[in-house]
Amino acid sequence: MKFTDGQWMLQPGVAAHYAAEAYEVQAHEDRLVVLATTRPIKHRGDTLQGPTLTVTLTSPLPGVIRVAVEHYAASSPPRLHIPMVGAGRPAVQVAETETHVSLTSGPLSVDVKKGEGWSLVFREGERVLTKSDWRSLGYIQWGAKGNHVHEQLTLSVGENVYGLGERFTPWVKNGQVVENTNKDGGTACEQGYKSVPFYLTNRGYGVLVDEAGPVSFEVGSEKVARVQFSREGESLDYCVIAGPTPKDVLRRLTALTGRAPLPPAWSFGLWMTTSFTTKYDEATATHFIDEMARRELPLSVFHFDCFWMREFQWCDFEWDHRGFPDPEAMLARLHAKGLKISLWINPYVAQKSPLFAEVVKQGYFIRRDNGLTYQTDLWQPGMAIVDFTNPAAKAWYQGHLRRLLATGADCFKTDFGERIPSEGVVYHDGSDPVEMHNLYALQYNEAVFELLQEVQGRDAIVFARSSYASGQRFPVHWGGDCWSTFESMAESLRGGLSLTTCGFAFWSHDIGGFEGRPPPAVYKRWIQFGLMSSHSRLHGSSSYRVPWLVDEESCEVLRTFTRLKHQLMPYLYAKAHEATQTGVPLMRAMLLEHPDDPACATLDRQYQLGESLLVAPVFTESGEVDVYLPGSEGSGAWTHLLTGEKKAGGRWSREQHGFLGMPLYVAPGSVIAWGAETERPDYDYARGTVLRVFELADGASAPFTIVGAEGEVAARGTVTRTGRRYIAEVGEGALRDWALDVDGRRSPPLAQGGTLAWEDV
């Protein structure tokens, strides 16, 4: 939201009161409390009338400083905040001089200037990260538009801003206005299903605005050298998070807001769905599954979308027996084929649902402020919305899902959760509906994930569309409704990179696009992109996404890249496990891996899976693609995973690829654990493993880790090169029937033992 009109003027009707001086600073053992006046205090008369702001500086985690700004303390209802499961009270250091007071937490400090001339300076060591200074912190009065608190933090020359949730606009957010409100808008607009009021910069710090309700970000779009964030109300809280690297920022962010548990290994395989409004029944599903098997197309999960239930009745949690006469027997047959089953749900109950009257009577829906049930025709006619702030409503909802799990479902696609009313409604626990709008997605997904963990244990997984800050605790998430075009494929990737830059470890998208019918080139290129993502799902709206309906070559592309992903699973699953321990996502923007390479600061058409594998999807019908390989002179060559071609880093190249190829490069000095299985993602990663060594320098060592399908470390060790001699040593766990591979030359396998020495001749 813009409050100014250019550099000097205010918007008509705006009265702005900016922090002008730190009139008083109270230093406590664990905090600083600053009385910020909005005018310089020259004499006693200046202390009368006009607002003051109380600014409290604390630390919830080493390397994180929280700034809580408050105008009126007692005239607003209790506020909701982002769940911070890791918040504590770490030891801080408070120091005071004649002119400044500072608070230090870990490597991060904030200096408060005493007296006239408002200034908060955030430093990591001696390096200034960002500042709140002249006309940065303000209290705004705007008549019918309400009162607002805003902060503006400075941007340095060349500083880029990233994140702010799943945003499909350009990955670098400078110049954009971002409204932190979940909306069901699709990927072709500025709205987002998963708002996260957090941004990361290439200067090595992040900012998390700790607000549940709407926050408006002006990213260099009101004051070009500042990020402004504001909310309506009498207060504003935010946290500055230290690096120094982007990965360090994400480690601290997720230590504060929570990390994802490890998804089951089977979930990394190929998912296929019925699509949305297509005509389908048991025969359709069975035909698709059998045809996949006949064509030797590996499949791990089959998903039944909305119409597994009867039309007009979502959700009643009952199979439509016209198309699925004996669902329990059907699911047993599908399980016997080695498949997992996913069912579509949403948090609404339509008026025609047999459950509707019961739920109204029990009071389990969100109500209007007159006490009646809130209903709408937007989506299901007459639908009402489950109130998850009511423990009984949550238990009722979980009870229906528990029954579905008992009869053969394995997981749920938790769709919707964005179109939640913000005005004129009442929640069971009295929560402010404005602040609940975004948090609703968290409560919905938490209710489902909590039940899945109880019943399925480590196999718990959702396929969620809506979320909010800290929602990474309930994986997996997908990018929502996209078009079947190259442009939409690219915007989907931008959304994924923005989301994973906010600490979400796992992300997916609809292979082939959701809306429309994908041309063959789009479909095949999206298959490549989809299988080189953390989770991979074929899904559409009004047309099926099975490959043989596109063309025969699509089957070959799908087979090739599904099998490739399966063989990469020992590497990918170790990186997935790493994400659960560190908060660094599996799918990483180039900036995360190469923060010191200026070329990586703006790249949003390629990414890395872990630190070793670079992926550049092809977004052209011709197969032409530009790819940048980071590095500098002497840093070693990147190796194409499929062809073995080597290229020096630190330069761009323009490549041409057929549909069975794409830019997949392995970083120099890497060891990729290569699996023995091509037909399924969940297998013993420590048996038949080949440690593929790429451009390991003479005298250097490279680590490897293999995590078992149950989440345990199966093997950990290093590969060392001395001249032409390579020695792999397993220091923890064990490998069986394993080998080394250097540039396609493979050692004899070692049945057992922790050391494999081989000379590459």
Name the predicted role of every residue range.
Residues 97-99, 104-106, 115, 192-195, ...:
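Short, well-ordered loop/turn elements at secondary-structure boundaries
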Residues 70-72, 298-558, 593-595, 603:
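Aromatic- and carboxylate-enriched substrate-binding clefts and catalytic-loop regions
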Residues 57, 107, 198, 292, ...:
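Conserved, mostly hydrophobic/aromatic
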Residues 1-259, 265-267, 273-275, 280-290, ...:
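N-terminal accessory segment at the very beginning of proteins
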Residues 27-31, 217, 221-231, 258-263, ...:
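Short, compositionally biased low-complexity segments
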Residues 115, 191-193, 202, 231-235, ...:
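Short, solvent-exposed loop/turn segments at the edges of secondary structure
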Residues 50, 191-192, 200, 229-231, ...:
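Active-site-proximal structural scaffolding
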